[in-house]
Amino acid sequence: MTEQRPSQQAKQPRRDVHGVLLLDKPIGWSSNDALIRAKRLLWAKKAGHTGTLDPLATGLLPLCFGEATKFSQDLLEADKTYEAVVRLGIRTSTADAEGEVLSERPVAVTPEQLRAAIGRFVGEIDQVPPMHSALKKDGKPLYEYARAGQTVERAARRVTIRAIDVLATDLDAAAPTVTLRVCCSKGTYIRTLGEDLGEALGCGAHLVALRRTQVGSLTLDGAVTLEALEAASEDQRAALLAPVDALLQTLPRVELGAEDSRRFLHGQRLPLQLSLPSAEQVRVYGARGEAGASLLGVAAWQGGVLRPERLVHL
C-alpha cells in the first residue's frame, strides 16, 4: 500500500501550540517562509518570528507560538550576535556576494591596521541603511527601489556595536578575508558594517557569509534545522519547543500562592513584601487550577505593588 503524502491526507485542524522553536535557518530561506513552514509542520494556530534574518544569512531565528507571541517584541528589541566573513578588496552593489562588482582595489592591510579600524566602529555609530534592505520608504521596501535601479535618500540611524572580535584573518590570500563576531543592538546592518570597514581600510569590502548565533539570551545551543523538524514525528516536533518562559529567563522570578495567583490572573494589583528593586519587571509563577505552579505572566514591581502587564493563558 502506497503511503499518502501529507498534502493527500485529510487536512488536520490547527491547534493551540505554545512555546518557542529555536530554528537554525538555512541559507536561501526568508524568515517568513521559514515561519510558515514551521507553523504548518506544528499545525499551530498562531505564530510569529522575532525579527527578520536575510535569506543569505543562516543561524538563529526564534519562532514564537501561541502565548509566546506576547513576548516576541522583547526579542525584537534585544541585542543580536553574528559571525560574519568579510571579503576585502571588492565592493559590490549590494554590499554582499550577490551584487555586481563596483570596484576592486589592492589589499595592503596589517593586523594592527585592522584592529585600529575595527575599534572605530565599537560603540554608538551612525549607519545609512543599505538599498537592498526591507526598511520601508513611503510604504515601499528599499529593495524594491533597488531592483528598479533607483536610489533613494536614506537617513542615517544610530545603532550600538557592543563588541567586535576578530575570529580569523587571511589578509595575504588572493581573496583576503576577515571573520568577525559582532554583538550589536537591533537595527544594525552587518553588510553595511562590512562595507564601511572596507572603506576605513582603504580597500573596500563586502559580506560573503553571515550567521546569527545569539538573540538576547537565546543561543544556537539546541537549535533545530528545518530538515530535522520535517523528519521528526508529531510528538517529537512538540518536544522540540522550549517553554514560553524561555524568553523570560533574564527577569527575576516571583511565586504566588493560590489566592494571589487567582487575583493576578484577573489583572488585580497585589501589594506584596518582596526583596526586589522597584520599577523592575518580573516573571510571575503560581497555581493555575490543578496544574500546579506555572507561568502566569509578566508584571511590573514598583512601590511594593505587583502590577500585571502581560498575562499568559496556557
Curated annotation (Swiss-Prot):
The active site is at residue 54. GO terms for biological process: mRNA pseudouridine synthesis; tRNA pseudouridine synthesis. It is an enzyme of class 5 (isomerase). Its EC number is 5.4.99.25. Gene3D superfamilies: Pseudouridine synthase, PUA domain. Keywords: Isomerase, tRNA processing. It catalyses: uridine(55) in tRNA = pseudouridine(55) in tRNA. It comes from the Bacteria. InterPro entries: PsdUridine_synth_cat_dom_sf, PsdUridine_synth_N, PUA-like_sf, PUA_sf, tRNA_psdUridine_synth_TruB, tRNA_sdUridine_synth_fam1_C, TruB_C. Responsible for synthesis of pseudouridine from uracil-55 in the psi GC loop of transfer RNAs. This is tRNA pseudouridine synthase B.
